Amino acid sequence: MSKEKKYRIGTYLILIPAILFLFPKVYAQHESKTINDSWKFYQGECKAAASATYDDSAWNSIHLPHTWNTDAYTEKKYYQGTGWYRRTLTLPKNWQTKQVFLKLDAASKAAAIYMNGRKIGEHNGGYTACTFDITPFCSFDAPNSLAIHVDNARQDIPPISADFTFFGGIYRDVWLTAVPKQHFHLTNYGSEGIFISTPQVSEEKGTILIRGEIKNDAEQKASLELEHIIYNPDGSIAQTQKQSIQIKGGELYSFRTETSPILSPRLWAPEAPHLYRVESILRDKKTKAILDHSNHHTGFRWFSFDGKTGFSLNGKPYKLRGICRHQDQKPIGVALTDEMHRRDMKLMKEMGANFIRISHYPQDDALLEMCDKLGMLAWEEIPIIDIVPDTPGYAENCENNLREMIRQHYNHPSIITWGYMNEILLVTQRRYKKEEELKPVLERTLSLANRLEKVLKEEDSTRVSTMAFHGSNSYNEVGLGNITDIVGWNLYQGWYGGDLTGFERFLTEQHKKHPSHPMIVSEYGAGSDKRLHSLQPHAFDFSIEYQQKYLEHYLPILEETPYICGGTHWNFIDFSSALRDESMPRINNKGLVYSDRSPKDVYYYYKAAWRQDIPVLHIASRDWTHRSGVQHGKAPVPLPVKVYTNLPEVELFIDGKSLGKQKTENYTVTFQVPFSRKKHFIFAQAENKESDQSISMIEDALHINFTPIPANLNETNLRNLELAVNVGSNCFY
């Protein structure tokens, strides 16, 4: 159950307690709460920690979400190992007659759970949830000891190699849930046991398919009634479905119901994300007491991918304007609050994105809920990256993680594709040079890909499958290119090698060779460091200006090439990658926003390109507030000042003097500005024609300090001149 849905139930309890007293059996007996507070934590191994009587008073007191890897922002060899979490649970007396479940939204990479010294179970996978029935292990007469052992060093669980930090810990919520003996199947791969799809969708009509499982944990049979209420986006009831169920003691009962057609459905799209709500109510047939209760949103939409015409949504061509997103933030790592996840989604939507690659792993439910509500199409994947190892249990863990991801997030209408491999030949080809060594690894990789493709289609035939390849034709040569429905290409021409025009050459070549293959540019990007600026930016200098140049080249190609379904920029944020030793060690700084989520200049370039509904005007290289240049005599020094905008023309002023107007090209305008004194005031304005009768002025301003460097240095002018030299780089620092 989503966090928001639980909050709604809780609010209902507070607002109308009188109704509960009058009709105590009518309200749902499904109780759920987080247990994020009052934990004890120990980093390392402790053999006795699972014991109910173990004294953990010397351990650190923490609250969830939590990670032990804040060291990854400073240490290349960050801690990868084990940790223990413990806390005491006192369970309500009235839970004695119920089934009690423990859910971990995520613990990286592996977790083993103990209650009162007894092992409940374990979970392999650091990015998907797991749920355990803990009823047989609980005490209702005395406090319970809960201990969780977490390990982020396991080599049989994906990922084992990647360009991001494998943060360890219980970094999402932990939940306790109590339900009557008859309830929805809560241990179904960490899902809620209810799956909703829209098998028939058009502008004229649509149907909703609701399927799932009910568990009877009592010994005796039960007569039940299952009701599904479909609510329109405006909250009115569209339809109701009821069925009677006879379920034996200990039985798991499967149900499947399709609604009659809903006429002229409100379609879900990024511009208008209309959501229908499906309320599922399980009752005792005789007493009408509500036993279990669930709410899920769904949306009517259909889509297609085509190798020639690209992507279509609801029958119309639609360009996927996307972003990839990692989930950490310096200095707290991946221990983000729900509101932090929501904030990121709002920032993306504000920029004009309509698509997110949730990479390289499943992320928090709060993020998926925002995708549905804000209108953000989504690609979600499991983290099989770089290489497939010959490790016992690895393939099984990959399969389980894929099933978990699909079942846990199946009901989100925003999701259009599931993925399961990223750049899987990158490390493979580097590590194995000899044919006899490479061949078995390729066979193992192909075998796993085919296995996962089969699982994906069994789990969900309504969405498409995808893999992301690095810029090498070897994927097609070994047969990986023919397995999934669509292919994503991670392309960095002009950054890691080659020149910028290699980007369009590669895409053209792939399209000629495989014209029927739908294609997404699943990664592209260039790093930037706010301390580095350049008048002659070039690849891998990490200057703010080269990131601008790079993206100004890539984005028009993505927008204007019809057979490209779209692209997802790598990455939305500057994220933790502990192995990196670049201008900002331990950070991959390709983000459109900094780690603290303050926007970079290129954020506004995208906003200007993607938001045609609002005016955008932004003076670029905004972090470059102290500039310098070589001055001949007393003549002003001309330096470029760039403005990002979606308005037709821009007028620029320096210290109140107009430098004229210039036409906008590729959402940019660049002026040569005469700098001469220590401090200048730069002011940009543009007319925004709101209607034939209404024109408003859009403005932006920036103070720039300028240091002139005399063309001829001598004893006199050197006395008051601080001359800094950035050795090995042409960047200003």
Language-model features, listed with the residues they occupy:
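Bacterial Sec-dependent N-terminal signal peptides
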Residues: 1-30
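Accessory beta-strand-rich segments of carbohydrate-active enzymes
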Residues: 33-35, 45, 75-76, 80-187, ...
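Extended substrate-binding grooves/exosites of carbohydrate-active enzymes
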Residues: 43, 61-73, 118, 153, ...
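Solvent-exposed, conformationally flexible loop/turn segments
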Residues: 82, 141-143, 205, 248-252, ...
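Beta-strand-rich binding/interaction modules
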Residues: 113-115, 204-246, 253-256, 638-661, ...
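Extended acidic/polar, glycine-enriched regions
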Residues: 138-141, 211-306
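Surface beta-strand/loop "capping" patches
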Residues: 182-217, 607-647, 709-718
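Compositionally biased, intrinsically disordered or flexible polar/acidic segments
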Residues: 711-733
